[in-house]
Amino acid sequence: MQFIFFGTLFSGLLLVCAVTNDIEDASGETPGIVSQITEEQPHQRQKLYNWDYKDLGTIAFEDIPFPTLQPSQTIDQSENCPEGWIRYSDSCYWVETELLGFAKAERKCSEKQSTLFVANSIDEWEAIRGHSKDSFSSWIGLVRFSHYERSEQLPRWQTEGAVNPSKINWLIKPYSPLVNGWSQLANCAASYKSPASLETASYTYFYPCTYLFYSICERNSTIANSLH
């Protein structure tokens, strides 16, 4: 009888542990896992992270075919950027003033042989963000998709070598995804530029990817070659 009792008790404890490990909060996060990851977590990505629009036909995205790209044009640091583009270091930037969802914004950048803006340094982040439109948010190349971010806190830039995402100006600091708007339906990051001179009035936040915002494209020879 004692053997049966302890065996039943042990089985019950295993069942409780299994159920606890499967519990998720309303956002889809598993409590106690994401919070264990530090903001300095290594964040290595492949050279170009293509989010393949054919696989984005979900609540958050539209099924948008990838554009037909024109032959690559090398951008040399000594050359001027195309008319209307902004130069910083060896890259050119385009501030798109048509209101678009995230997927369409990225597609429009691709048509210009560019990606959504990826900051390689805080200096670049501040310089280019300063050209965005006052009182509006602009899409950038930063996402945190729920199906592959269960075990890490940081969102992903579209290209490698970018600044640690936790270092940019999130609305709530120190950075945590949930307090900065992230949910299963709000996966895409946008940068809001305040008309006020106070720096803390501008911020980065997660939004549903179907929201209509402006966007910032970035283009250089490395990006152009990677898109082909």
UniProtKB/Swiss-Prot annotation:
It holds the Pfam family Lectin_C. The keyword tRNA processing does not apply. Keywords: Disulfide bond, Glycoprotein, Lectin, Proteoglycan, Signal. InterPro entries: C-type_lectin-like, C-type_lectin-like/link_sf, C-type_Lectin_Receptor_IMM, CTDL_fold. PROSITE patterns: C_TYPE_LECTIN_2 (PS50041). Residues 1-18 form the signal peptide. GO terms for biological process: immune response. The keyword Glycoprotein applies. One of its GO terms (cellular component) is external side of plasma membrane. SMART domains: CLECT. Disulfide bonds join 109-217, 188-209. Residues 88-218 form the C-type lectin domain. Glycans are attached at residues 27, 220. GO terms for molecular function: carbohydrate binding; pattern recognition receptor activity. SUPFAM superfamilies: C-type lectin-like (SSF56436). PANTHER family: CD209 ANTIGEN-LIKE PROTEIN C-LIKE, KILLER CELL LECTIN-LIKE RECEPTOR SUBFAMILY F MEMBER 2. This is C-type lectin domain-containing protein 88.
